[in-house]
């Protein structure tokens, strides 16, 4: 029997949400270019949903906004929090209207076994390590231009100078711990910091643990 050429199945994905707080495209362009200059790898090619709940109805040219974002190599898959008028604009632009998931209690499906990967060497520029459904422990340094990613937490017993992304599947309890924090970028469940954010907290080039506090990152120094 010939296997069907396509199947429709339900699934869930973690998407980053870009909150649009004004209809002023010049202002959006200015702020967007600043963020892209800080961390281009974090945004470019990543699927995004536009949250339009803060936009005054009838003021935003959604087609022009989409063209602006696409010109910066951003991938827009839909909108949320849109008024009826903006939803019609979204439909004309080929964008889906996405509703945020409700926090209902559902039976938990069988989960994959939790894993921990241990790396006993330096992670060098150009290298990427990803741990699915687990934690990453590194006994060594993560150099400039290197990326370490885990669905769970990341512990680095050495210097972090590259990028570290924990909670890649949306796990908000994930943490990033390093003996020497001097990263290009740190991200937990889609919230990110650059080196200057750590400088404001006085922990640059020191040991520390980064975690989520509500919807913002926070860091505490550690006596490592």
From Swiss-Prot:
Does the keyword Signal feature in the UniProt annotation? no
Q: Which is a GO BP term held by this UniProt record?
A: regulation of cell division
Entries under Pfam families matching the protein: MinC_C, MinC_N
Q: So where does this one cross the membrane?
A: none
Which keywords does UniProt give here? Answer: Cell cycle, Cell division, Septation
Family note: Belongs to the MinC family.
Q: Which PANTHER family match?
A: SEPTUM SITE-DETERMINING PROTEIN MINC (PTHR34108:SF1)
Name this polypeptide is given = Probable septum site-determining protein MinC
Specify the species: Shewanella amazonensis (strain ATCC BAA-1098 / SB2B)
């Amino acid at each position: 029997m010939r296997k069907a050429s396509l199947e429709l199945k339900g699934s869930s994905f973690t998407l980053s949400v870009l909150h649009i707080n004004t209809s002023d495209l010049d202002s959006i362009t200015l702020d967007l270019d600043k963020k892209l200059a800080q961390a281009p790898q974090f945004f470019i090619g990543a699927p995004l949903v536009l949250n339009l709940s803060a936009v005054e109805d009838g003021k935003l040219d959604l087609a022009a906004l989409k063209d602006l974002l696409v010109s910066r190599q951003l991938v827009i898959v839909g909108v949320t929090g849109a008024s009826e008028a903006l939803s019609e604009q979204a439909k004309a632009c080929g964008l889906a209207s996405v509703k945020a998931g409700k926090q209902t209690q559902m039976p938990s499906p069988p989960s994959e076994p939790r894993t921990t990967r241990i790396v006993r060497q330096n992670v060098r520029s150009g290298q990427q390590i990803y741990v699915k459904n687990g934690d990453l422990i590194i006994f060594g340094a993560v150099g400039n231009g290197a990326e370490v990613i885990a669905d769970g937490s990341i512990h680095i017993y050495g210097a972090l100078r590259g990028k570290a992304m924990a909670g890649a599947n949306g796990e908000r309890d994930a943490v990033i711990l390093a003996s020497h924090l001097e990263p290009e970028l740190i991200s937990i469940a889609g919230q990110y910091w650059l080196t200057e954010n750590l400088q404001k907290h006085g922990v640059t080039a020191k040991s520390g643990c980064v975690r989520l506090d509500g919807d913002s990152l926070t860091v505490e120094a550690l006596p490592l």
